[in-house]
């Protein structure tokens, strides 16, 4: 979720190879986007399974659950898979997944954005891909990094065992929960427990006092409902923590790639002390061993959430960059059809993932 302030600085465009390498019309086959649907899961997995990309933006479960809010679309082009979406009326693209000519695909995205009267905005660009982006886009490339949107990635074995001195406090939380609630049990998330999960989600939304925060969590609630309604089609794994017959917590997630699992959602009733720690440990300990890493997503700049995520000793913080390229040369502005008002974008693009 990356807020970016857009402003105009004369001379941003250059004659770098981003503009001149791909002059030949043979490269400019159009991107054929279509709305993301459940039928696209195998297509997305074909590209992400062995890509080694661990950012949560590429979890199909996330992409599908939030698709209505962002009008998410997908297309294949030149060996790449591309996602296009909107936030606050601004067009954006995820960093493409695949193999091929990076300059060609970035130019194709620029052409697509210009056709729709927008500058090119790339999100979810991990550090490993910045050299390709900067080489292709040159001086036209403007980069924004926001610590609030870095993904927390952990070793699965570490979260499952909670061993070592640094995680002693977490083991204490687990032991206290077991002492307070000796009748607790963990069960796999099945259709039987979906109504209780949705009820806990509803109470979580209603507990928010600030109206702006309520709207934000209401959007997440809709995404949760959508994901749980298509649990099997999305290949979700999940679990519920029960005290007696009352639900204390639930969680679910889905693969990002072959070795990384994304925990998409984790909710707990705070009346049950230690429920968050226990649901996390119980769930991760049951994940298949093929998942070396667990992505627990961003902290969004929330102080308490950041402290909690850091306390689990992440293996890495995966920084994600936003990259903006603007049509600033007069001829390009005219070719793209940008008006001065469209070109001088000065408002923020709200959180996308």
Where in this protein do the model-derived segments appear?
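Non-cleavable N-terminal signal-anchor transmembrane helices
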Residues: 20-83, 336-337, 344, 353
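A conserved beta-strand-loop-helix scaffold within acyl/acetyltransferase catalytic domains
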Residues: 41, 45-71, 184-269
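Intrinsic-disorder-associated, low-complexity terminal segments enriched in Asp/Asn/His/Tyr and depleted
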Residues: 8, 16-17, 27
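Conserved donor-binding loop and adjoining core beta-sheet/short helix segment
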Residues: 57-129, 133, 242-270
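Active-site/acyl-donor-binding loops of N-acyltransferases
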Residues: 142-161, 295-353
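Aromatic (often tryptophan-rich) hydrophobic motifs at membrane interfaces
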Residues: 235-326
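Acyltransferase donor/substrate-recognition loop-hinge adjacent to the catalytic core
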Residues: 138-215
């Amino acid at each position: 979720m990356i807020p970016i302030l857009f402003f105009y600085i004369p001379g941003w465009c250059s004659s770098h190879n981003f503009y001149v390498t791909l002059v030949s019309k043979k490269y400019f086959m159009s991107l054929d986007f279509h709305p993301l649907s459940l039928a696209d899961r195998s297509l997305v997995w074909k590209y992400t399974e062995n890509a080694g990309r661990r950012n949560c933006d590429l979890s199909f479960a996330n992409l599908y659950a939030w698709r209505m809010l962002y009008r998410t679309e997908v297309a294949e082009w030149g060996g790449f898979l591309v996602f296009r979406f909107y936030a606050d009326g601004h067009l954006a693209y995820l960093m493409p997944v695949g193999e091929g000519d990076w300059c060609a695909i970035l130019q194709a995205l620029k052409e697509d954005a210009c056709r729709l009267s927008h500058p090119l905005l790339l999100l979810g660009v991990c550090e490993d891909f910045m050299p390709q982006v900067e080489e292709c886009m040159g001086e036209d490339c403007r980069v924004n990094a926001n610590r609030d949107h870095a993904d927390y990635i952990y070793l699965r074995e570490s979260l499952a065992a909670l061993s070592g001195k640094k995680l002693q406090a977490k083991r204490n939380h687990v032991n206290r929960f077991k002492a307070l609630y000796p009748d607790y049990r963990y069960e796999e998330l099945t259709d039987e427990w979906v109504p209780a999960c949705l009820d806990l989600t509803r109470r979580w939304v209603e507990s928010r006092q600030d109206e702006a925060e309520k709207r934000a969590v209401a959007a997440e609630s809709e995404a949760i409902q959508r994901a749980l309604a298509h649990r099997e089609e999305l290949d979700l794994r999940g679990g519920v923590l029960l005290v007696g017959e009352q639900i204390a917590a639930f969680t679910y997630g889905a693969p990002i790639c072959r070795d990384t699992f994304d925990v998409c959602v984790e909710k707990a009733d705070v009346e049950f002390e230690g429920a968050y720690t226990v649901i996390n440990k119980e769930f991760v300990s049951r994940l298949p061993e093929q998942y070396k890493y667990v992505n627990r997503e961003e902290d969004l700049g929330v102080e308490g959430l950041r402290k909690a995520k850091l306390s689990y000793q992440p293996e890495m913080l995966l920084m994600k960059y936003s990259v903006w390229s603007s049509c600033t040369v007069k001829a390009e502005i005219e070719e793209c059809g940008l008006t001065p008002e469209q070109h001088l974008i000065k408002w923020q693009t709200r959180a996308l993932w």
